[in-house]
């Protein structure tokens, strides 16, 4: 095979993430690859809240069509955007190394989160982030903003927000780590399920799958599978009020989860053998549901 074609979203971050995979393929196999850029439904409807246009697969379905039509050998996704049930024609061939999983605060004026004024306006499009911000500071005014990193930074200025909350992973991959004012403790301010992880999706038994299988990161796979099992048991998606944190502790896996039940955020944790990662995620969800 002379060249691999990898489908991805058009955003700068999606392209940078795909270039990370392309670089790894070049390093391991000395094989060239190129991007096939796709505009997804989630990208087209920037003026509508994600939970109003249906969460599952908004950033994935159009890219999967390119795989079905044999226009690309693989697709690179942020795993937090991938529904817990992948259509039978496809597989998540590899979950690669995980970037910083934390959420961060970017201040409009270099004021730390703990020092922002009473009634400060903070921008986020995530109901998970909004709810956890309110738990930390009930006085905050949450302003919904969507778009890529650059768009949100622009909206922060235009709408005179006191700050915005974003994922550390995207900022670091874009080389914008210097914008971060504060990091939230992921055990207190839980990230999205699979935050910071990249997944490579292929058709089952695809000709090029062997190349992508070589990029699997074992530890990232364990934690992401556990978190996705947790989300599946709750029948949620990346736009539900669900958060998860997981870490490998020797032979064990420690997990924390949050979920909204009737307007109340329920938080539980669990510890167990890491080889039972999928069952652990399921049990954590059952523990939360009571």
UniProtKB/Swiss-Prot annotation:
| Domain of life where this protein originates | Bacteria
Keyword ATP-binding in the entry? The reply is: no
User: What pathway does the UniProt record associate with this protein?
Assistant: Porphyrin-containing compound metabolism; protoporphyrin-IX biosynthesis; coproporphyrinogen-III from 5-aminolevulinate: step 2/4
State any single GO MF term.
Answer: hydroxymethylbilane synthase activity
Co-factor binding comment: Binds 1 dipyrromethane group covalently.
EC code(s) of this entry: 2.5.1.61
Looking at the UniProt record for this protein, which Gene Ontology cellular component terms does it annotate, in alphabetical order? cytoplasm
Decide whether keyword Magnesium is in the record. Answer: no
Further information in the entry reads: The porphobilinogen subunits are added to the dipyrromethane group.
The identity of this protein, by name, is: Porphobilinogen deaminase
């Amino acid at each position: 095979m002379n060249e691999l074609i990898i489908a991805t979203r058009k955003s700068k971050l999606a392209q940078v993430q795909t270039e990370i995979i392309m670089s790894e393929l070049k390093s391991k196999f000395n094989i060239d690859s190129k991007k096939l850029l796709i505009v997804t439904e989630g990208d087209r409807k920037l003026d509508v809240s994600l939970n109003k246009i249906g969460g599952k697969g908004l950033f994935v379905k159009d890219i999967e069509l390119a795989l079905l039509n044999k226009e690309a050998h693989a697709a690179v996704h942020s795993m937090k955007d991938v529904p817990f049930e992948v259509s039978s024609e496809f597989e998540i061939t590899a979950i690669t190394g995980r970037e910083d999983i934390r959420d961060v605060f970017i201040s409009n004026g270099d004021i730390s989160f703990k020092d922002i004024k009473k009634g400060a306006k903070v921008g986020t499009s995530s109901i998970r982030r909004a709810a956890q911000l309110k738990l930390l500071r009930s006085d905050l005014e949450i302003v919904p903003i969507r778009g890529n990193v650059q768009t949100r930074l622009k909206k922060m200025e235009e709408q005179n927000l006191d700050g915005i909350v974003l994922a550390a992973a995207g900022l670091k991959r874009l080389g914008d780590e210097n914008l971060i004012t504060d990091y939230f403790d992921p055990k207190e301010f839980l990230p999205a399920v699979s935050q910071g992880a990249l997944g490579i999706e292929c058709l089952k038994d695809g000709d090029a799958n062997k190349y992508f299988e070589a990029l699997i990161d074992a530890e990232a796979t364990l934690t992401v599978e556990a978190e996705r099992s947790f989300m599946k048991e709750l029948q949620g998606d990346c736009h539900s009020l669900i958060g998860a944190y997981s870490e490998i502790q020797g032979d064990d896996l420690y997990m924390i989860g949050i979920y909204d039940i009737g307007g109340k955020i329920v938080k539980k944790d669990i510890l167990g053998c890491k080889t039972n990662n999928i069952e652990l995620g399921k049990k954590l969800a059952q523990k939360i549901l009571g």
